[in-house]
Amino acid sequence: MKKQDISVKTVVAIGIGAAVFVILGRFVVIPTGFPNTNIETSYAFLALISAIFGPFAGLMTGLIGHAIKDFTTYGSAWWSWVICSGIIGCLYGWIGLKLNLSSGRFSRKSMIYFNTGQIIANIICWALIAPTLDILIYNEPANKVYTQGVISAVLNIISVGIIGTILLKAYASSQIKKGSLRKE
């Protein structure tokens, strides 16, 4: 079995990605009026980092970024949601493996694939796993946490669907397309 090393580029991406995740999570959110539930731009950025650098980078960026954001905002981390940020980053990374953004192409078919995957991933993470962990870890009332989870899932689907798709398209457009250079 071949040992896979983590590249310096991936470690740097995790560090920078986590820092940007914290900044977006602290300062670029839109309150919804429902407790501890916001429209988050950080998950669209997490989708970009995960799609470019893979599932491990997405996992670590989500875990580290969310934990630091919680510690700097509330004084402690809400671990059930920190774990889910890592899971969603990993899932975005798996979705991104098929996108091949470095080829310079992000077609309509790729957009549909990405958005179908992120919808399923957000529902699983935020509407199912996060509330269940809230109940198991913190003994929170089920009706409250499942309501928060569904609202968060819907808001993240919208945020990642719009902002994340724009970021992925912009990144792919910045890459040199294979076969685009010609000898004169």
Curated annotation (Swiss-Prot):
Pfam families: ECF-ribofla_trS
Keywords: Cell membrane, Membrane, Transmembrane, Transmembrane helix
Membrane-topology descriptor: Multi-pass membrane protein
Disulfide bonds: none
GO cellular component: plasma membrane
Cellular compartments annotated: Cell membrane
Transmembrane segments: 11-31, 44-64, 77-97, 117-137, 148-168
Family, similarity comment: Belongs to the UPF0397 family.
HAMAP family assigned to the protein according to its UniProt record, in alphabetical order: UPF0397
Protein name in the entry: UPF0397 protein SAR2767
Annotated organism of origin: Staphylococcus aureus (strain MRSA252)
